Amino acid sequence: MPRGLELLIAQTILQGFDAQYGRFLEVTSGAQQRFEQADWHAVQQAMKNRIHLYDHHVGLVVEQLRCITNGQSTDAAFLLRVKEHYTRLLPDYPRFEIAESFFNSVYCRLFDHRSLTPERLFIFSSQPERRFRTIPRPLAKDFHPDHGWESLLMRVISDLPLRLRWQNKSRDIHYIVRHLTETLGTDNLAESHLQVANELFYRNKAAWLVGKLITPSGTLPFLLPIHQTDDGELFIDTCLTTTAEASIVFGFARSYFMVYAPLPAALVEWLREILPGKTTAELYMAIGCQKHAKTESYREYLVYLQGCNEQFIEAPGIRGMVMLVFTLPGFDRVFKVIKDKFAPQKEMSAAHVRACYQLVKEHDRVGRMADTQEFENFVLEKRHISPALMALLLQEAAEKITDLGEQIVIRHLYIERRMVPLNIWLEQVEGQQLRDAIEEYGNAIRQLAAANIFPGDMLFKNFGVTRHGRVVFYDYDEICYMTEVNFRDIPPPRYPEDELASEPWYSVSPGDVFPEEFRHWLCADPRIGPLFEEMHADLFRADYWRALQNRIRDGHVEDVYAYRRRQRFSVRYGEMLF
């Protein structure tokens, strides 16, 4: 290769990233208009489009580089010089951390995820100690209650860029002040003030005002979800001021926010104070930088691995028929490998399973489906793998494993947040905890269905319980759109003998689902059955599911809240708003 080509390649990659992030910001900047126009289908499409942008631009850069190099292979020394030139371009670059991830993605695409070493990639950042210079435009604005909290909140709301009319601004402010007074007390509230992010955070059918409530005893989250009535008037649905509530809003089972962030690292640092339980990876994920979140997640995994002497083991729970799942006992992630052969009742291919996981990545997860990160050629040290797990890997996924002596390479896997399997949780809890879990499970099914997702396999083992007690679906191999399912009532038996026969007395076609059958395996436990019948008996009726299908086909997009219904102002303090 001619000398000097290394710099051209480095510049081409960085220019490609500039183009990608420019389009990312362009799509994001349309969130306000989509919200104001209540164009919820455009909201969903924009979310998918933004996710696709990254891989699209990586592909464009790869094609450019193949043209520049005439498709010739490049030796290790050449690639090292490219990385050195790229690193020199980054010290004054405002989004250096994501630019490093983009470089990694281009390299992996060029070399088919092979030779992934710290020398060739930004496994760790080239600027780990970098601090932010003066930000041209502050991320947030401070508001002090010099003339009382009603006046402060009126200024905050009047400062918003939204151009729609408010249904009842004074009422909403009254509700917020009442909530803050109940939370902090009058004296503490008088000594507190707000810091509010300049940009709204858009997701689904809400625009979120995100701020910090700075009190004498510490800083709390201050989150206001802004919704629209059917008449297109704005109202504030609740006020959230605990770290647990904020953590759920920014949770790993929700779609990414659309928030205009030219300096994403600065926004992540600003958010960290009100989301102390979130890792750097989770914060980048929440604002839509999912590919860099993958980089940060891998770094967190490496740091954990370096500091522990644990071995990977099979994950607790009932062994899956499609996925082999393993974990490190002290690490909050699971690693999922598609098996070489599935159980006989699973009539599907590995390609189908991967397509299901991609569907979940792009769809509105409504807080009920765990996000995943996909890896290729994932290297594990054999010394970190328990003998039992190694035997299981070779038995169930040998076609995806390459033995390198002291290491193995797994050709493809997913990493996902670890949860307590719901079936195990239900065995361990009683009383109100059991009731809450069954209520959560039913709510998860309803919210998934409202978002046009049918889980397929609804067994408790396919759901997990988060640290906040939320029930989340995580087994996607049978997932499909609600509109693809034919929900049927079981026809009455023709003769008494029909009910005793080993085969059904009615025809069953692909795509047929009989909700009455759910009762057999959801209500078998005598502790659970009565609770389920009390709270979710309608899930056993085909007409319930068909009514949901009709709403989806009519173009209706349901409201899904990142908080309990009882937290809504309309429920806590007043009559229903509409």
Curated annotation (Swiss-Prot):
Keyword Plastid attached: no
Q: Which Pfam families match?
A: AceK_kinase, AceK_regulatory
Enzyme active site: D371
This protein's record includes keyword Kinase = yes
- Per the UniProt entry, the Enzyme Commission number(s) are 2.7.11.5, 3.1.3.-
Q: Where are the transmembrane segments?
A: none
GO biological process: one example: glucose metabolic process
Where, subcellularly, is it found?
A: Cytoplasm
Q: Which GO terms describe its cellular component?
A: cytoplasm
Q: Which PANTHER family match?
A: ISOCITRATE DEHYDROGENASE KINASE_PHOSPHATASE, PTHR39559
Protein function: Bifunctional enzyme which can phosphorylate or dephosphorylate isocitrate dehydrogenase (IDH) on a specific serine residue. This is a regulatory mechanism which enables bacteria to bypass the Krebs cycle via the glyoxylate shunt in response to the source of carbon. When bacteria are grown on glucose, IDH is fully active and unphosphorylated, but when grown on acetate or ethanol, the activity of IDH declines drastically concomitant with its phosphorylation.
Q: Would you tell me the protein name for this molecule? A: Isocitrate dehydrogenase kinase/phosphatase
The organism that produces this protein has a lineage beginning with: Bacteria, Pseudomonadati, Pseudomonadota, Gammaproteobacteria, Enterobacterales
